[in-house]
Every structure is written in C-alpha cells, then in structure tokens.
Amino acid sequence: MVTIIPLIKIKMENNHLKYQVVKEQYLKFLSSQEVMSEPFRDKLGQLKNFYLPISRMIKEEYTKEKKTKLIGLSGGQGTGKSTISKILKIILKENYGLETVIFSIDDFYKTLQERKMMSKNKSALFLTRGVPGTHDTKRLYNCIKKLKDQKFKKFKIPKFDKSIDDRLPKNKWLKVKKKPNIIIFEGWCIGVPPQKKKDLIKPINKLEKQKDTKKIWRLQVNKELKKKYKKIFNLIDKLIFLKVPSFKYVFKWRLLQEKKLRITGKGKKIMSNIEISNFIMYYERLTKHMLKILPRKADTVISIDKKHRLKSIKFN
C-alpha cells in the first residue's frame, strides 16, 4: 500500500526544518556577538517579530524580477546596522537560498591623503571622516552597478580600517566571486535627502558655531547630497530605516560600542567620552534631519527603544 503525503504537509515540514536551521544559526551568531555585560534580550521574539518579516519582504522584492536587489539599511551610530545585516544574511540564505553581499558606506571613505587635500581646498572639517563629501562616490556608484550587472564579473570591494583612519591595501579588500541575489548596503546616512537652504543658516552645535562660521562645510555637505549621493541612493530598491528615540541615544550607544571594543580587545584605538562627544557633533545635523524625514520616506521603519531593543516595525 502506497501512502500519499499531502503536498501541504510536506511544505509545512520543510518550513519547520528551515526554521529550525535558521533559529540555530541565528542563536549561534548572537552568542558570538554577546559580551557578558550586554546580553541580547528576547532573542526568539526578535527573530519572529522583526528579522523573519524583514527577510520575507526582501525575498518578495527579489522574486518580482529575479534580479539583484539593493537593500539600503540606514541608521545612526550604534543602532546595530552591522548585526542586523548579518542576521538578515543568515535568514536569506537558510530560508530562501539567496546569496547576500554586505558592505558599508564606511568602506568607501576617501583615503586620509584625499581628505587632507579636501580639508585644505574646502574646509578643515572634511579631514574628519563621516559626512557626505568624505566618501569616494564614484567608486561606490561603480561598485553597486557592477554588483547589479547581469553580466557579473568577480571583483573586490574596498575595506576601510578606522583604527588607522585609512583605506586598506587591495589584498585585504572583500572578494566577491559570485553574483549576489541581494546586496545589503548599510550606513549612517543612507537615503538621506538634502536639507533646505533656510535650515542650514543656524549652527546646530558648538562645532558648527566655532569651526563653520561661514557655513562652507555644511553647504558643501548639502551640495554633495543633492548630486552625487542622490545618484547612488536612487539605485536602492528598498530602504530600511532604524529610528532611534532621539539624537542623545546616538552618543549613549556609541559609548556602548567603545565599551564593547574594550571588553573584547578588538579596538586598537579606543575613544574617550570627550572624544566621542566631539566626534558625533559631525553627525548631529544629518542625524536629526533623518529622524524627521526618513520615517516617511523609508519603505520599512524599525523603531528602537531607549533600552536599545527593536520596539516596532512599520512597512510603508
């Protein structure tokens, strides 16, 4: 006698097996990222309520045309962009068989020498990496186009070492040998539009008041957003925004990042509290602008609560 197993039952069993694999890989990854003083909370709840729905949205976007899709992941410093990107990569691979490449806008910072030249020709503030204008936008645009190209050829993505404040040599760049289905492009200013001119008049903090008295720096940053960065952001198929409660938590969570680096011993150059406070002033204007604009502009908004936990998700 032949036993016929309904297709729906087979599908349910396969889905259950996939979930078990995803759960195992997910928990294993989180375990590797934890430090004793800051354990991850509600791990399975976060998987079910956030990571699985987001990965499903990405998969559905890919299924529309079966072409490489660029997913922008935007959020202030310390919001967890790198961790979220890696978790999504695990789920997309194990659940849907999709190959994912992750890279950060940080890896496309101009070299130290290039920023020194820019600081002489434009504003001394451009020596400090971070704001639009301090990235190699031509290289970044070409990289995304190559990854999305149907006639894909293997190539390398730059790597930037923040401990030396410079780009690494080519032999240490990320090798992409296979055409990806999904590209996760993460960074603190991904998808941010330029500001209105009237919003640039008043300095937003001590840095701008004392070191950008003629508005040269912030006007140039805005100019970069209007042209070069807009061209790059237009390539994004879906934009995910990590919304923080307020800018003060960017400082708080950046302190947490430095604390973790001290504990794990991964940081070669750890910043003091005063150094962090001064450093994030460079990011303040655009971070506050993003908090006003991106909750309406992004395709998906993930709100993060004051305790650094994923609080809610909204698909626009």
Where do the protein language model's features map onto the residues?
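Pre-Walker A adenine-sensing motif
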Residues: 53-64
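Walker A (P-loop) phosphate-binding loop of P-loop NTPases
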Residues: 78
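Conserved nucleotide-sensing/catalytic segment adjacent to the nucleotide-binding pocket
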Residues: 101, 110-160
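Phosphate-binding/switch loop-helix module in NTP-utilizing enzymes
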Residues: 146-186, 191
